[in-house]
């Protein structure tokens, strides 16, 4: 299934190049950029578990970002959301979230949740997400959610 918004598409990795880009963006942006070298494991079994949907944000032949959408009943969990560094601060994070929400809606999801980096909380708030609990605002990875319209 392919979801499009403007010139961007959300697609499941298919080729070796797709998977390489998917894992490379996650490793560099979510781990190494935060000083965690040698920690990322591209072969985690949950990556391809039932209900888990790795996705790439692409525009033409450019790999822009990644997210894994885990669907469990009427809730989807956005995991490891990242925009590659050259494409940051261009509105693509908002595009990625909007496409992930369209994906979730197509899978009968009514609520999207994500554990986000503390410095990303203001961005998620601007995108309509709410903190699960007020005490979560000070957590290392606050839990946030958004109710989707039917």
Labelled PLM ranges:
Residues 1-17, 150:
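Conserved N-terminal entry element of GNAT/NAT acetyltransferase domains
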Residues 24-60:
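Active-site rim helix/loop that mediates acceptor-substrate recognition in acyltransferases
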Residues 56, 62-70, 77-82:
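Conserved beta-strand in the GNAT
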Residues 71-81, 88, 138-141:
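A conserved beta-turn-beta hairpin within the catalytic core of GNAT-like acetyltransferases
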Residues 83, 89-102:
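Conserved acetyl-CoA-binding loop-helix of GNAT-fold acetyltransferases
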Residues 97, 104-117:
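Conserved GNAT acetyl-CoA-binding A-motif
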Residues 118-140:
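Conserved active-site alpha-helix within GNAT-family acetyltransferase domains
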Residues 146-147:
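A general lysine-centric signal
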């Amino acid at each position: 299934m392919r979801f499009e918004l403007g010139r961007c598409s959300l697609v499941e990795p298919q080729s070796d190049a797709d998977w390489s880009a998917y894992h490379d963006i996650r490793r560099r942006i979510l781990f190494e950029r935060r000083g965690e070298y040698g920690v990322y494991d591209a072969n985690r079994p949950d990556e391809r578990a039932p209900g888990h949907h790795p996705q790439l944000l692409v525009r033409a032949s450019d790999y822009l970002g990644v997210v894994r959408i885990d669907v469990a009943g009427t809730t989807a969990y956005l995991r490891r959301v990242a925009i590659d560094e050259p494409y940051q601060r261009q509105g693509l994070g908002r595009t990625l979230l909007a496409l992930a929400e369209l994906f979730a809606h197509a899978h009968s999801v009514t609520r999207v949740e994500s554990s986000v980096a503390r410095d990303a909380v203001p961005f998620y708030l601007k995108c309509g997400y709410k903190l699960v609990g007020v005490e979560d605002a000070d957590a290392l990875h606050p839990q946030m959610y958004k109710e989707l319209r039917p």
